[in-house]
Regions:
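Conserved acidic donor-binding segment of nucleotide-sugar-dependent glycosyltransferases
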Residues: 286-294, 302-308
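Conserved donor-binding/catalytic core segment of Leloir-type glycosyltransferases
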Residues: 166-185, 191-195, 202
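Nucleotide-activated donor-binding/catalytic signature segment of Leloir-type glycosyltransferases, i.e.
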Residues: 214-235
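Short alpha-helical donor nucleotide-sugar binding micro-motif in glycosyltransferases
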Residues: 231-232, 239-244
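A charged, aromatic-enriched C-terminal amphipathic alpha-helix characteristic of glycosyltransferases
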Residues: 20, 306-342
Length: 342
């Protein structure tokens, strides 16, 4: 089978190795290369012969999108694919307004959704992760549905870590891992729910700078049921997944919720935002919450800690549907279907 040559570009400045978009890019590279393809992650230092690529995937949205598109459209062979990140949490109508009118290419007023809208017809096709993203691209940008391919995102955990789970040994706490200071992760309401409903909460992840550190300690100091364990290595993270009875992701802004997928295959009950795309991945087997409602968050976590939930059915479902082998073959199939002759 002929190898496909692919370049993946992230169109924004990035300083976080563990950011969701860059993690997705590395997973795609690894998975597609295991199928025999050639994948380059583009940076500013390498030498790239653009006309040797079959595809250039623009992964995500950002301020560098226009620069890349204006430069790359001069190369004739590669097809350019958009794999956008649509985690918009307000109304569809406001998304349409924002994407069409909030920004100006002529005046160099760059806004990610406006820039994506401006470039919408420059892409050969789109790769989306959910029906939620598909609707925004099809209806918001007026893109033919035949040019939109929905591909599930795979979890990144190697199968060797996914031993059988002893649910009887699960510990009675709720776990959360994220960029804790990001407003979209809604950590403050999660903490307030733990304080009000007195359940054990373990927080992990990054906090940026002294201001965020002070903010976190103001919220949790003096509350012995809440613990911050810092940034975790992968092995440490997997250990907390395997021990926790519940994982909570009550985000206001969330694209897929990779950490919730990961936690589910370690046997956690999942508390999940009812906003946006993440709920599509769980087939009705997550406890959905209104992320603005502390009581809803707290009561659903307490219920899940009592053992009311969807495991082990959820674990089996995610292992079957979101493993790397299945998802990468789906992506490879789409690329081969649309491949042009050299």
């Amino acid at each position: 089978m002929e190898r496909i040559r692919i370049a993946i570009i992230v169109p924004f400045a990035n300083v976080f190795y563990s950011g969701g978009v860059t993690v997705q890019g590395r997973m795609w590279k690894e998975g597609l290369e295991e199928l025999g393809n050639i994948v380059d992650l583009v940076d500013n230092w390498g030498k790239f012969d653009w006309n040797t690529y079959d595809y250039i995937i623009i992964l995500g949205n950002g301020k560098l999108l226009l620069d890349y598109m204006f430069l790359l459209r001069g190369f004739k062979h590669p097809q350019i694919i958009s794999a956008p990140i649509i985690d918009y949490h307000k109304s569809f109508f406001s998304f349409v307004l924002r994407s069409r009118y909030f920004g100006s290419v002529r005046l160099k007023i760059n806004k990610p959704f406006h820039d994506l809208y401006y470039c919408r017809n420059m892409f050969d096709f789109y790769l989306v992760r959910s029906e939620y993203e598909s609707r925004f691209i099809e209806k918001g940008f007026h893109i033919d549905i035949k040019k939109i391919y929905k591909l599930p995102l795979n979890f990144r955990i190697p199968m060797r870590y996914l031993k059988n789970i002893d649910f009887e040994k699960k510990e009675n706490f709720c776990f959360h891992s994220s960029r804790l200071g990001s407003p979209g992760k809604n950590v403050e309401r999660l903490i307030k729910a733990a304080i009000k409903y007195d359940f054990n909460l373990v927080l992990a992840g990054s906090i940026k700078g002294h201001e965020q550190e002070s903010w976190l300690h103001r919220l949790i100091d003096g509350h012995h049921n809440i613990q911050y364990v810092g940034w975790l290595s992968d092995e440490e993270l997997y250990d907390y997944y395997s021990r926790a009875k519940v994982f909570a992701l009550p985000s206001i802004i969330e694209g897929v919720g990779m950490v919730a997928l990961e936690a589910s295959i370690f046997g956690c009950e999942i508390i999940l935002t009812n906003i946006g795309a993440p709920k599509e991945y769980f087939n009705g087997m997550a406890h959905l919450v209104n992320p603005y409602d502390i009581d809803d968050i707290g009561l659903k976590i307490k219920k899940a800690l009592l053992g009311v939930g969807y495991q082990p059915r959820l674990r089996k479902y995610i292992l079957n549907r979101n493993n790397s082998d299945y998802c990468m073959k789906e992506l490879d199939s789409v690329l081969r279907k649309n491949q042009k002759e050299r």
